[in-house]
Amino acid sequence: VAQNIQLEVKYKMYVKIHETENKDIVAVCDEDLIGKKFEEKGLVLDVSEEFYKGEKMDEKRTLEIMKKADILNIVGEKSIDLASKNDIVSKMNIIKIKGIPHAQVF
């Protein structure tokens, strides 16, 4: 008996929590940007594995963590879009380096 199984493919993002004494810094990036570096007009966006490559999470879990973060560092179209749609980051705070959106939220 054959069964039709439909799997919902959700986009995953890397989420890494850097704990300090006073605040938690959360780094979020699109999975396809890990390890890449972008430079434009003296600005450098280094999506290093050390800082960004934490646990791969779906949008729901990523959003839960974003909402609780003291400081956010977000890179990539999908990650920024998730934060923007949920009023975590304002469009005014988003910069683009080589077309890659980036925002910091304090």
Language-model segments: residues:
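Short, surface-exposed linear patches
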Residues: 47-52, 68, 94-98
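Short, compact, well-ordered microdomains
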Residues: 73-106
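Charged, low-complexity surface patches
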Residues: 55, 72-73
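Conserved mixed alpha/beta catalytic, RNA-binding, or beta-rich assembly cores of soluble enzyme
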Residues: 11-64, 103-105
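Short active-site oxyanion
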Residues: 66-72
